[in-house]
A protein has these predicted regions:
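Preference for long, well-ordered alpha-helical segments
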Residues: 128-162
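Conserved alpha-helical segments that form or flank metal/cofactor-binding pockets of metalloenzymes
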Residues: 51-81
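Acidic/histidine-rich alpha-helical segments that form the ligand environment
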Residues: 96-136
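Short alpha-helical scaffolding segments that buttress acidic/His motifs in well-ordered protein cores
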Residues: 49-54, 84, 88, 100-108, ...
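Mobile cap/lid helix-loop segments that border enzyme active or cofactor-binding sites
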Residues: 1-48, 68-72
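Alpha-helical scaffold segments that form or flank carboxylate-/histidine-based iron centers
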Residues: 11-18, 43-59, 89, 125, ...
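A ubiquitous short alpha-helical element
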Residues: 13-21, 86-92, 102-106
Length: 162
């Protein structure tokens, strides 16, 4: 149950309704989400490794339950998410997927631990435009996921597909 009273239901779900207290800001949040999900050039598994890592950190019920629309075509299933949850020990994730999860974890918990050695590993696997993409994705995942967790927005009855 959300920790703030929700406006009249919009039909879009509580993950949207809570933000409708400030419609202009809600529109901006929606546009940012659309830009991130629609504009990323990261592979789906890389994006999902970063997104799910931050969802675990944020304890965002909505984010933890959200799945990718094209998941089956990219072998993104419950087993994949279990591997992401244990990315350090996973032998099933690619180097880029593990790095995306590690980047997301450091981004969310200790961005100052992103030292030159870590950036060298990142730049050995990703081009600079991909690192900019990953950074913007993680910013959106962290900010919006944390906001929904703070407000206490529950996962919807019907899973969100992105």
């Amino acid at each position: 149950m959300a920790r703030i009273e929700l406006p009249a239901p919009s039909g879009m779900g509580e993950h949207v309704d809570w933000a409708l207290h400030r419609p202009q800001m809600a529109v901006g949040m929606g546009q940012l989400a659309d830009a991130v999900y629609g504009g990323t050039r990261l592979a789906l598994r890389e994006r999902e490794a970063a997104r799910y890592t931050i969802a675990l950190i944020n304890h965002c019920e909505v984010c933890l339950d959200t799945r990718a629309t094209e998941a089956a075509a990219h072998a993104v299933d419950d087993g994949f998410y279990a591997e992401v949850a244990d990315w350090r020990a996973s032998g099933a994730l690619s180097e880029r997927e593990r790095l995306a999860a590690e980047f997301a974890q450091r981004f969310a918990l200790d961005h100052q631990a992103m030292d030159d050695a870590f950036w060298a590993r990142l730049r050995g696997a990703f081009a600079d435009d991909e690192l900019a993409d990953l950074t913007m994705c993680c910013g959106m995942f962290l900010g919006m996921g944390r906001a929904m967790a703070v407000v206490g927005v529950p996962a919807p009855d019907e899973r969100i597909l992105i």
